[in-house]
Amino acid sequence: MKLSLVVAVLCLVLLPAASFGQGEPGWNKHSLGANFELSIPMGDFADFLAGTGYGGNVRYQFGADSRGVFTATAGYLSWSKKDLGAGTSVQPAAFNIFLGGKYYVTDGFYASLEGGLYFVNYTYEGVVVGAEGNTTRFMLPIGVGFQKSGFEIGARYMLLDVDFNSFSFTLGYNFAL
């Protein structure tokens, strides 16, 4: 009795997972994925504005051919507070929207290029006064990664303006549609 219950539960879990998973590239194939993202700021962005960031993305992929994929990505990142001294700190956060593509060089390995907008919100906290500001910036993420059986891992260099760049590392899963 217990063994048949275990087998039934495994079938109920594994069979749908196998059919929904494996969002792989290919002609006219669609997938929807979710990624966790870790962002490490570089240059002036790290020196004056942000600590380590974290967030997530949702990505739609449409297969243009056996190696090329069009992508549409939306996500949110929040960086840790940066102490500016004299009792002041700043904490940026951003909502992003990107359009671009991936090219699968070999089975599973890809290079990606996207472009889009970062809607950035800065929160300043001081001893006497606090302030909040918003700005919109153009972003150009250039990356590499590996995708197999729906699972995806990647690294991107995020070009934001001239001095506000970061490395981002992603880990996620893609569901075939």
Kindly give the residue locations of the regions a language model identified.
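Residues on the lipid-exposed face of transmembrane beta-strands in outer-membrane beta-barrel proteins
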Residues: 34-38, 56-62, 76, 97-103, ...
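Repeated loop/turn-to-beta-strand initiation elements of outer-membrane beta-barrel proteins
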Residues: 66-70, 108-111, 148-154, 177
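Outer-membrane beta-barrel translocator domains and adjoining extracellular loop/strand segments
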Residues: 44-51, 82-90, 122-131, 163-170
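Bacterial N-terminal signal peptides
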Residues: 7-16
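Positively charged n-region of N-terminal signal peptides that target proteins for export
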Residues: 1-5, 22
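Residues that define the transmembrane beta-barrel architecture of outer-membrane proteins
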Residues: 28-32, 48-56, 91-95, 134-140, ...
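Outer-membrane beta-barrel translocator/channel fold
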Residues: 75-92, 112-122, 154
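Short glycine/proline- and aromatic-enriched beta-strand/turn motifs that initiate or cap beta-hairpins
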Residues: 20-71, 77, 158, 167-168, ...
